[in-house]
């Protein structure tokens, strides 16, 4: 979305049914996770405003494709994996994982940003080395 001068991301919280997980208050969870990740030093787009009644978040827009789009095009910057691992060095001691899927990352200005505000309790089977890394490989020619 735009105000005529700048672009923004307007994220609408959605409530899809899930048989194996109870989300609780998703808006409050996103806000709590944003603050947690921000305090840890995870690169995030800035949260600019919250419309609680409509469950919407207004975030800074980072121009450019996601890491997933770039990986699909055969483009993997040499430092992306190091940047994700640097995030892990902040997350794991705090007992957290993030969603390491490349659609949740946008490279901008030499920094890989995590554009989702979600984090979860650390579980080794869902950490970067055991789960996320498999999605950060270039497609076979």
Regions found by a protein language model. Name each.
Residues 1-4, 60-61, 108:
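Active-site beta-strand termini and strand-to-loop segments that position acidic
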Residues 1-28:
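ATP-binding glycine-rich loop module of kinase domains
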Residues 22-40:
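The N-lobe alphaC helix and its flanking beta3-alphaC-beta4 segment of protein kinase-like domains
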Residues 42-83:
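Conserved structural core of kinase catalytic domains
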Residues 83-90:
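Conserved hydrophobic core/spine positions of the Hanks-type protein kinase catalytic domain
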Residues 92-97, 108-141:
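C-lobe/activation-segment region of protein kinase-like
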Residues 100-105:
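Hydrophobic residue at the +6 position relative to the catalytic HRD Asp in the kinase catalytic loop
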């Amino acid at each position: 979305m735009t105000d005529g001068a700048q672009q923004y991301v307007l994220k609408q919280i959605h409530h899809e049914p899930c048989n194996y997980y109870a989300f609780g208050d998703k808006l409050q969870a996103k806000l709590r996770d944003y603050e947690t990740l921000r305090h840890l030093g995870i690169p995030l787009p800035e949260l600019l405003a919250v419309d609680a009644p409509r469950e919407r978040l207004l975030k800074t827009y980072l121009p450019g494709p996601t890491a997933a789009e770039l990986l699909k095009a055969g483009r993997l910057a040499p430092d992306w994996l190091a940047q994700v691992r640097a995030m892990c060095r902040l997350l794991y001691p705090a007992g957290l994982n993030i969603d390491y899927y490349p659609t949740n990352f946008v490279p901008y200005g030499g920094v890989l940003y995590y554009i989702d505000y979600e984090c979860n309790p650390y579980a080794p089977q869902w950490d970067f080395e055991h789960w996320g890394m498999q999605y950060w490989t270039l497609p076979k020619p």
